Amino acid sequence: MENVKQTIRAPRGTELQTKGWIQEAALRMLMNNLDPEVAEKPEELVVYGGIGRAARNWESYQAIVDSLKTLESDETLLVQSGKPVAIFKSHEDAPRVLLANSNLVPKWANWEHFRELEQKGLMMYGQMTAGSWIYIGTQGILQGTYETFGEAARQHFGGSLKGTLTLTAGLGGMGGAQPLAVTMNGGVVIAIDVDKRSIERRIEKRYCDMYTESLEEALAVATEYKEKKEPISIGLLGNAAEILPELVSRGITPDLVTDQTSAHDPLNGYVPAGYSLEEATKLRAEDPDRYVQLSKESMKKHVEAMLAMQEKGAIAFDYGNNIRQVAFDEGLEHAFDFPGFVPAFIRPLFCEGKGPFRWVALSGDPEDIYKTDEVILREFAHNEHLCNWIRMARQQVEFQGLPSRICWLGYGERAKFGRIINEMVASGELSAPIVIGRDHLDCGSVASPNRETEGMKDGSDAVADWPILNALINSVNGASWVSVHHGGGVGMGYSLHAGMVIVADGTEAAAKRIERVLTSDPGMGVVRHVDAGYDLAVQTAKEKGVNIPMMK
């Protein structure tokens, strides 16, 4: 695909480029995904996560933009792996856009077949929020990362990470949240990345405190701050598959160890040990098969080092990039001896229908987001943990692209919040409509046996009906755009997941759609976990009145 050097930035204000606010929202969010403040490699249409793209190629991108500008408010645009393929007459309450990205028949659901199709221009990798146009930069994963490290602190360190050292790697669009999430929980973190640009980007956006190319300096600073029980985040330039084994050989054991490199994609997401970034780029182009094999061997060493640290007392967990699976496939029989982050720390939240709920101010005015922050602080004042998050986010999170906010809200809370936001748009308190969406990593919208659905109580880890049902109910309930993707987070063959976005434009019709969608969407999370036999989900369903025919 041809790289194009152009700066894309979503329009701001209330002047429409399209025939309605829902079409306008889709257009602005597509463009926002490719804003240089937001996207990792906008010239390649790559938003985050290795090769997670917003559109298949530049011709398709322009065709999507043109289609959205002429789309009527009773029509629906269909997008197949980043390419607009049809516009059909529908109705005003139907989604304006339906997207299916990276989906392959199971027997062919592997990277090799995907790459054949990609090279022919027939498919793109949509990751989760890249191809579904609701990525908001690193903030999008920040609260989930904060919650994960917070729960680790509660389970293992008396409620705080003060006086602890976390070791991790991967400072891309997702992993870049880790340094700030650890320091928000009071801890010290060394975060490794092979790409200097990634570390510098996190420092620029205040997600990471300092940069070093010296392991000795990183360890000295980490030790100093750990002893002082003060937080600091250290971005260390290097390769985790080299640095972790070196630390093991020195007998240095962190308190926590995890990883968020893009190991889900051995070709485009991971750099083999012994190679500089430049050397790796050259090898990737000249001999991709050898590159993949070297990557997989390095991942095995990486996981071996994490297991060695676990044996010495570190709390180790997989952060959802499928690195354990690769190591296992390479012959490391005990690769799954440390858990994934969802069963270890997050699943109780899923049982309550909670997940990474986000909203974006189409006006471009940060004041609109600050006003919505006040809504959270007022309406959910009883939830001190949530309110603390909002206060910290206001102080420490720098917006990327259109102003946005994320917080984990549960069943009932999402619909309540959406209702209030729509009323604020209607009254003029907010200067333009608000886009409400979420990550595909949510309570009822993903099947991913090595991540979100790992170790389900009833063994239903691989059942993929749930994300499809989620997309179907959100579509019929009037979500503004709905997406079904394959391979996000953990790579080809390992996940199916669905996304939704709903626009609060202040109309009565929007109010009804919001009520329906923001009830059924988290409701699917409660239903999914009731079906798997989780008592907390059953309790939630009974308390909230979720109608589940065979619930006991």
Curated annotation (Swiss-Prot):
Keywords: Cytoplasm, Histidine metabolism, Lyase, NAD. It is found in: Cytoplasm. The keyword Cytoplasm applies. Its EC number is 4.2.1.49. GO terms for biological process: L-histidine catabolic process to glutamate and formamide; L-histidine catabolic process to glutamate and formate. It is an enzyme of class 4 (lyase). NAD(+) binds at residues 49-50, 127, 173-175, 193, 239-240, 260-264, 270-271, 319, 489. Binds 1 NAD(+) per subunit. PROSITE patterns: UROCANASE. GO terms for cellular component: cytoplasm. Its main location: cytoplasm. One of its GO terms (molecular function) is urocanate hydratase activity. Belongs to the urocanase family. This is Urocanate hydratase. It comes from Bacillus cytotoxicus (strain DSM 22905 / CIP 110041 / 391-98 / NVH 391-98). The gene is hutU.
